[in-house]
Swiss-Prot record:
With S4 and S5 plays an important role in translational accuracy. Located at the interface of the 30S and 50S subunits. GO terms for biological process: translation. The gene is rps12. GO terms for molecular function: rRNA binding; structural constituent of ribosome. GO terms for cellular component: chloroplast; small ribosomal subunit. NCBIfam families: rpsL_bact (TIGR00981). This is Small ribosomal subunit protein uS12c. Keywords: Chloroplast, Plastid, Ribonucleoprotein, Ribosomal protein, RNA-binding, rRNA-binding. Its main location: plastid.
Length: 123
């Protein structure tokens, strides 16, 4: 326990909060270009082929981003919008691709949770 005199001499240092998505550089989203689109397998108790893309962002970072939803139209050189948000069972995947913007089309035949998958309201 420091004395008041010690605190006057040098104040307590604030603990700095480490960001969970440094590649976005404090922006809500970033634009990027897909350099590789592929599938990976998740960690131990789960089993699947998760669709991910390697994206070169405008901030200069190259990150791995998850492609949500069933089916996608992304390929190399597709321009995508990337947001933060990790995928718990894919190590190293800390970003999501926003569906329904730029070159990423919305999920086909989606009727529930449409706003999360870039789908317009059906007529």
């Amino acid at each position: 326990m420091p004395t008041i005199q010690q605190l006057v001499r040098s104040a307590r240092t604030r603990l700095s909060k480490k960001t969970k998505s440094p590649a976005l550089k404090s922006c809500p989203q970033r634009r990027g270009v897909c350099t590789r689109v592929y599938t990976t397998t998740p960690k131990k108790p789960n089993s699947a082929l998760r669709k991910v893309a390697r994206v070169r962002l405008t901030s200069g970072f190259e990150v791995t981003a998850y492609i949500p939803g069933i089916g996608h139209n992304l390929q190399e050189h597709s321009v995508v919008l990337v947001r933060g948000g990790r995928v718990k069972d894919l190590p190293g995947v800390r970003y999501h691709i926003v569906r329904g913007t730029l070159d990423s089309a919305g999920v086909k035949d989606r009727s529930q949770s449409r706003s999360k998958y870039g789908v317009k309201r059906p007529k």
